[in-house]
């Protein structure tokens, strides 16, 4: 017996090793979305690469779509400035701990990576008085990369040449009132002369500006500004420069060798005066015939809270009004010194919550949609849904040149198109192209327009009137304030073959939408379903339903709503599923579930069931209610009333599904800790956690047909046999549902997922896949089984008898719970023809387990998300090809792959020519 046992053990081990090598490997592949808390921006016009630094110490480089690289400083200090060494593929970063770091783009395995190669500690840590004078406020890297100039808080300028040898600029021939070092204030700006690289402009906080000759080491010109300085910029000829100030104004200064000491500027303007204005933090002067760009400067009293950037060109004047703070901006323009004008083509603005690009060549200066860095959180993400292998027909129905185009994307075109759908707090669903490294926005669907909400958007608010001053123009899409939290999307289900979509929200709204290429003006049918039926003694204390608009509504081409199913009470929808071939949707809340035939919506073909336990008083409070809990006595009186009512009714015989697997203590393996049964008194036991449709054997072993399955928070599973009329009779007959089985898991753990497997143990194909020859027909000869996943264990039951076949308890760790599961298909690395299905599971500890199906053998196990990252775990989503996404911040998805074959990661190259003498830059 011992030998046999060993052999079996070896076989299992071999199975696991085989799976690991052929199918599985865990890789965190790419971060999609917008970096959390950006703090610095740089652009290399030669390589056409953009770099963003963040408060957590990350540096991210972006070029053409697909060209992305990320580096992370060892210490999590904020990146305060970043500068490219022009054309060299190197970056200098300054952190707020007063350290400077040199990064290099290096080639490894024929692709580019960003690597830190050197770091340099400057004297002076923050918060220590004696050294705060040496704290760096501004950096200038000369275009030739031969010299680095650092301005400090104490007013000093340090020059670093080869090997970081330090020189200090002495302040000779400065007027008496500026002589005392501290009274100059910190260095605010250092700018290289655009025509003579041996000269730099030094701007001090108190207003003094010095033109310094680096070769002769003396002052060429002094400009005696009296207003507190914020920023300096040269005009490209070098004959003049502009200074911007804390009073909201800017000044133009002439540079003349015949006048070494200039007291007054040529002109001085406060564009948004005369009342006190906020500082102009940064200004750019770009010549076409004329052109200025600056951030800030708003009238303090009336618009002091606005985040603005102004574009001035002759008589054209636009105040770009953003919803988050301007971090930095640059223009893409001609850098050839010989040319007369800058002729900027685009303005790139990094904001705290998004990246906005303005086309400066087109009339009206429109925004350019970005192919990456999408602000996923323009309204908070509330749910998500992934569609792999999107058919071309759907793709073509839901899909401008991007100016930042450095590097080469080496990744082959993806073999199949993938869509990521995100539901948001404002009632929108956004469609993203998730086929490659860049998560690209494709389409936005809004559901708010079918309801009467308190805050109807007024167009007059978004566009400035002709007479309005300043001439504001709302730009960007970050809008964190939802008009009505009830609009938030909770669940999404989509049929990629028929172009049908179901979205469900926070106030019990379930909306069926159909993809249309034509504009439409129609009324939406509304069907109301009372999930409490005739239950007495329950009063909903939560929010009201969203009132639908009366009359017809105009809908643009795209997904258009055809019917609104309103659950009553209007609690958040907790589960939804769609079967487009049968014209059915199923939906669930904390009170029950319903089945709806949307094809026969005129006669409202409904079936519904209440899942409320007699003592589910908490389910009546609603997520937006202020009521936290009911007094115990009230709950007990509810229980007494309900017990007397329920006990008198005849009930379907509940199968104790665990009875056949009633285990003895001796059989409990160390990995599978004993599960404690839960009491039916646990709050919210009636919440419907999952729903599924399947064509399988429920009534007997010879006749298969449509079924619907529902699982609840208290470990109940309901299975219904459905009579679905044939296609020809859809209009005449309605669907009928008959309760076939009711299963109660003994440990009463919430049911996370239900899936029916065919005779070979494979998941059933999606609707339309078989009828359109897109998938093999399922095995209807062998006996089917149902996989039921609860928070504590997996079980496979044979159908139609619902006899237990196999199980696995995932509770080795105290408090370990299943959070997300999916059936994924893993294709072999060695052969595309060979693939295996597996059950992928994420726990509340953040680790991922992969199990064989239907045997439920553990295959591999990976640490993925920190267990403290509750929102990351809650947002995790698995794809059918073994990839996954989870939010690492409100604005970024981390993408990962469990498949050794299907990996979406940056594969790019940046070709650079560097001078041989690297010591000059080390």
Give short role names for the model-derived ranges.
Residues 334-337, 357, 371-397, 819, ...:
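Intrinsically disordered, low-complexity regions in large eukaryotic scaffold subunits
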Residues 268-377, 580, 591-592, 698, ...:
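Non-catalytic interaction/regulatory modules that flank or connect domains
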Residues 313-317, 321, 331-338, 342, ...:
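Extended amphipathic alpha-helical scaffold segments
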Residues 1-35, 346-348:
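Intrinsically disordered terminal extensions that flank WD40 beta-propeller domains
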Residues 32-42, 77-84, 123-141, 177-193, ...:
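Canonical WD40 repeat/beta-propeller blade segments in eukaryotic WD-repeat proteins
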Residues 47-51, 69, 88-92, 101, ...:
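Structural hallmark of WD40 beta-propellers
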Residues 56-57, 97-100, 154-157, 206-207, ...:
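Short coil/turn segments within WD40 beta-propeller repeats
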Residues 17-27, 61-70, 102-126, 154-185, ...:
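Per-blade loop-tip surfaces of WD-repeat and WD-like beta-propellers in eukaryotic adaptors/scaffolds
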């Amino acid at each position: 017996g011992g030998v046999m046992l060993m052999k079996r053990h070896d076989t299992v081990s071999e199975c696991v090793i085989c799976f690991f090598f052929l199918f599985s490997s865990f890789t965190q592949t790419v971060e999609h979305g917008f970096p959390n808390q950006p703090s610095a921006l740089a652009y290399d016009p030669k390589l056409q690469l953009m770099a963003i630094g963040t408060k957590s110490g990350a540096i991210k480089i972006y070029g053409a779509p697909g060209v992305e690289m990320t580096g992370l400083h060892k210490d999590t200090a904020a990146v305060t400035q970043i500068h490219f060494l022009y054309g060299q593929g190197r970056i200098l970063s300054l952190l707020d701990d007063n350290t400077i770091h040199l990064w290099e783009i290096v080639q490894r395995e024929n692709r580019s990576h960003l690597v830190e190669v050197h770091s340099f500690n400057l004297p002076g840590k923050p918060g220590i008085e004696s050294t705060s004078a040496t704290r760096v406020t501004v950096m200038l890297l000369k275009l030739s990369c031969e010299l680095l100039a650092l301005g400090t808080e104490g007013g000093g300028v340090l020059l670093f040449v080869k090997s970081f040898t330090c020189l200090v600029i002495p302040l000779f021939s400065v007027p008496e009132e500026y002589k005392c070092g501290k009274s100059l204030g910190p260095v605010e700006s250092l700018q290289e002369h655009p025509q003579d690289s041996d000269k730099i402009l030094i701007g001090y906080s108190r207003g003094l500006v010095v033109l310094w000759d680096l070769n002769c080491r003396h002052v060429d010109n002094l400009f005696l500004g009296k207003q507190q300085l914020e920023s300096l910029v040269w005009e490209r000829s070098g004959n003049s420069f502009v200074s911007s100030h804390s009073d909201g104004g800017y000044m133009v200064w002439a540079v003349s060798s015949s006048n070494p000491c200039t007291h007054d500027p040529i002109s001085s303007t406060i564009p948004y005066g005369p009342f006190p204005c906020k500082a102009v933090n940064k200004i750019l002067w770009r010549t076409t015939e004329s052109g200025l760009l600056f951030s800030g400067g708003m009238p303090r009293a009336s618009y002091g809270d606005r985040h603005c950037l102004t574009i001035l060109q002759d008589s054209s004047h636009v105040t770009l009004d953003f919803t988050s703070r301007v971090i930095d901006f640059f223009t893409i323009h001609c850098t050839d010194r010989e040319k007369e004008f800058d002729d900027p083509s685009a303005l790139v603005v990094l904001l705290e919550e998004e990246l906005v690009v303005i086309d400066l060549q087109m009339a009206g200066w429109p925004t350019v949609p970005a192919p990456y860095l999408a602000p996923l959180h323009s309204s908070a993400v509330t749910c998500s849904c992934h569609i792999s292998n999107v058919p071309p027909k759907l793709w073509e129905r839901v899909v401008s040149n991007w100016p930042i185009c450095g590097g080469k994307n080496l990744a082959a075109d993806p073999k199949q198109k993938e869509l990521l759908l995100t539901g948001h707090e404002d009632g929108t669903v956004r469609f993203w192209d998730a086929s490659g490294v860049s998560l690209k926005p494709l389409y936005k669907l809004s559901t708010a327009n079918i309801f009467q909400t308190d805050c109807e958007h007024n167009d007059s608010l978004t566009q400035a009137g002709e007479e309005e001053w300043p001439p504001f123009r709302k730009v960007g899409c970050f809008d964190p304030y939802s008009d009505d939290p009830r609009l938030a999307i909770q669940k999404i289900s989509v049929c990629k073959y028929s172009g049908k979509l179901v979205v469900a929200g926070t106030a019990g709204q379930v909306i069926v939408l159909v993809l249309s290429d034509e504009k439409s003006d129609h009324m939406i049918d509304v069907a109301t379903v009372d999930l409490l039926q005739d239950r007495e003694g329950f009063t909903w204390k939560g929010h009201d339903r969203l009132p639908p608009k009366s009359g017809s509504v105009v809908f643009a081409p795209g997904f258009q709503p055809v019917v609104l199913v309103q659950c009553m009470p209007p609690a958040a929808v907790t589960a939804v599923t769609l079967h487009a071939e049968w014209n059915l949707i199923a939906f669930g809340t904390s009170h029950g579930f319903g089945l709806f035939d949307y094809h026969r919506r005129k006669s409202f073909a409904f079936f519904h069931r209440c899942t409320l336990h007699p003592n589910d008083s908490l389910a009546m409070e609603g997520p937006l209610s202020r009521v936290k809990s009911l007094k115990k006595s009230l709950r007990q009186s509810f229980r007494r009333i309900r017990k007397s009512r329920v006990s008198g009714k005849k009930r379907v015989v509940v199968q104790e599904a665990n009875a056949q697997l009633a285990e003895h203590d001796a059989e409990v393996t160390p990995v599978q800790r004993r599960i404690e049964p839960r009491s039916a008194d646990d709050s919210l036991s009636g919440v419907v956690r999952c729903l599924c449709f399947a064509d399988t054997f429920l009534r007997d072993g010879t006749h298969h047909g449509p079924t619907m399955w529902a699982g609840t928070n208290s470990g109940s599973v309901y299975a219904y046999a459905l009579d679905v009329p044939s296609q020809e009779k859809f209009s005449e007959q309605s669907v009928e549902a008959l309760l076939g089985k009711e299963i109660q898991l003994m440990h009463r753990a919430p049911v996370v997922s239900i899936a029916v497997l065919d005779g070979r143990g494979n998941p059933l194909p999606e609707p339309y896949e078989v009828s359109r020859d897109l998938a093999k027909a399922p095995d209807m000869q062998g006996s089917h089984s149902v996989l039921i996943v609860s928070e504590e264990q997996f079980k496979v039951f044979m159908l139609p008898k619902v006899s237990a076949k196999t199980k696995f308890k995932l509770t080795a760790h105290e408090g370990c719970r299943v959070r997300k599961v999916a059936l994924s298909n893993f294709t072999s690395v060695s052969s595309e023809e060979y693939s295996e299905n597996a059950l992928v599971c994420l726990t509340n500890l953040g680790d991922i387990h992969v199990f064989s199906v239907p045997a439920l053998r553990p295959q591999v196990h990976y640490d993925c998300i920190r267990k403290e990252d509750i929102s990351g775990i809650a947002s995790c989503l698995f794809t059918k090809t073994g990839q996954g996404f989870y939010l690492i911040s409100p604005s970024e998805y981390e993408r990962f792959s469990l498949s050794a074959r299907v990996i979406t990661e940056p594969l790019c190259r940046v070709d650079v020519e560097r001078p041989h003498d690297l010591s000059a830059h080390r």
